[in-house]
């Protein structure tokens, strides 16, 4: 195991209290009457939207009082075993913006979003008792940490409280696959062809109808700041390819711009390997990662675009990328914790190294390869890296430096604004040769730089020092 690889500033996160403020429901007489009636609660994790959201539809049509709950779990803001902060400033700020907008959207539906800091398994039980919760609706998660919290919660609350969980993060719902998860193809192309032929994408779910105003709790819930989470704020970089904010509203604005205003979608296949600017790719991944945008919303907007504007290779290719996202989720659903193992899902052994100096040189953009360095500096300064960049720096880390690929994956988890556990570890396994790449390729970084940064503009942008550095 590698000792602390990054600076000591973040060490204060270990001392972060599990609950900074203990919330107590402040009830008016009206609310007291309300709580006598059975209530339901939507427990939010990576499904941070109101539209096309199964849990909210189920809850608001139940006939009961409805509340929502989100907790900033301190485990997500401490340090990993590799020494990296689990969540750095870029993604944390994006999440704060997402929760802020979600709270406002729910207020418009007369639903209170309870926001806390702490382990949900410790915070939720008191609300279940005080609000007379009889059913908890939530999105199914299957990776280790999420399952542990769910198991703790089930132990902590009365057995008569019902759990209603749903898969709501896929393009192709698991129930609509033409095979069992255990029979999932180990090669993406096989998965894609079978699903395209035999599966279908479900229609978007209806919007929620506002509830009576009596449903609202009088208490206001404060959303934590970066400082509350023990994270130092970072200034937005003027050259960032991801200058966007969190939340479903911003996601919809981006979708409308990329599709209808600029019609960039028509050229997506030609531009998707770009490196500079906000429009070479869709940039939907960050909203997809925390569930403030659903893949179905994107898919059906593509279908509308194909009917009204043009249907071509580019419109298909964005669906193709959504299928890759689905595939890595299904790979983790099939293989569970093996996606975190050094040997990966192939149980393939390599001679990996844990050279701290090499790891830090990679992180700081001080390797022998300028193209790798430029991408790593971009990541450190903006929380973003292009898909082409990610493939190259990961291949260099695992195949050239021969470093334990899980360290690189953990650093991406820390830094990326669009971190998604399934895509991150699925892609890292793929590149490292322990995942779903049947050819076990190694990127020639210099040839890649010549092809995708022929004039060297991207490398100059990030490798040249400024007056303030």
Positions of predicted regions on the chain:
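Glycine/tryptophan-enriched, flexible segments
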Residues: 182-341, 452-453, 457-469
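Trp/Phe/Arg-rich N-terminal binding region typifying the photolyase-homology
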Residues: 22-203, 377-378, 423-427
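Alpha-helical packing segments of well-folded alpha/beta enzyme cores
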Residues: 55, 98, 102, 251-254, ...
């Amino acid at each position: 195991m590698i000792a602390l690889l990054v600076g000591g500033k973040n060490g204060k996160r270990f001392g972060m209290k599990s609950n900074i403020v203990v919330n107590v429901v402040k009830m008016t007489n009206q609310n007291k009457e309300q709580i006598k009636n059975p209530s339901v609660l939507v427990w939010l994790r990576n499904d941070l939207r109101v539209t096309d959201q199964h849990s909210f539809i189920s809850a608001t049509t139940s006939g009961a009082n409805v509340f929502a709950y989100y907790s900033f779990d301190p485990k997500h803001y401490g340090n990993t075993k590799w020494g990296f902060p689990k969540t750095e400033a870029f993604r944390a700020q994006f999440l704060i913006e997402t929760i802020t907008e979600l709270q406002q959207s729910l207020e418009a539906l007369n639903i209170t979003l309870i926001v806390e800091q702490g382990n949900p398994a410790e915070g939720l039980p008191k609300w279940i008792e005080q609000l007379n919760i009889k059913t908890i609706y939530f999105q199914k998660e299957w990776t280790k940490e999420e399952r542990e919290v769910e198991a703790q919660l089930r132990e902590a609350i009365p057995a008569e409280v019902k759990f209603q969980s749903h898969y709501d993060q896929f393009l192709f719902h698991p129930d609509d696959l033409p095979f069992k998860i255990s029979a999932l193809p180990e090669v993406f192309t096989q998965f894609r062809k079978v699903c395209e032929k035999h599966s279908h994408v479900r229609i978007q779910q209806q919007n929620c109808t506002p509830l009576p105003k009596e449903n609202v709790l009088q208490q206001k819930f404060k959303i934590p700041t970066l400082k509350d989470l023990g994270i130092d704020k970072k200034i937005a970089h003027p050259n960032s390819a991801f200058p966007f904010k969190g939340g479903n509203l911003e996601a919809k604005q981006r979708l409308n711009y990329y599709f209808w205003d600029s019609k960039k979608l028509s050229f997506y296949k030609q531009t998707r390997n770009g490196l500079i600017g906000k429009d070479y790719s869709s940039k939907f991944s960050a909203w997809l990662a925390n569930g403030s945008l659903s893949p179905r919303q994107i898919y059906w907007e593509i279908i509308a675009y194909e009917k009204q504007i043009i249907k071509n290779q580019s419109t298909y290719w964005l669906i193709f990328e959504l299928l890759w996202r689905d595939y890595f989720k299904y790979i983790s659903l099939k293989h569970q914790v093996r996606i975190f193992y050094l040997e990966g899902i192939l149980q393939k052994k390599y001679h990996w190294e844990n050279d701290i100096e090499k790891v830090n040189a990679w992180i700081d953009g001080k390797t022998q390869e300028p193209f790798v360095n430029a991408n790593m500096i971009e990541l450190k300064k903006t929380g973003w890296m292009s898909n082409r960049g990610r493939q190259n720096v990961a291949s260099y880390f695992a195949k050239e430096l021969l470093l334990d690929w899980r360290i690189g994956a953990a650093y991406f988890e820390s830094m990326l604004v669009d971190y998604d556990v399934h895509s991150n570890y699925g892609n890292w396994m793929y590149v490292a040769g322990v995942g779903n790449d049947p050819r076990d390729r190694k990127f020639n970084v210099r040839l890649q730089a010549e092809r995708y940064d022929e004039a060297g503009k991207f490398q100059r942008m990030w490798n040249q020092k400024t007056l303030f550095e």
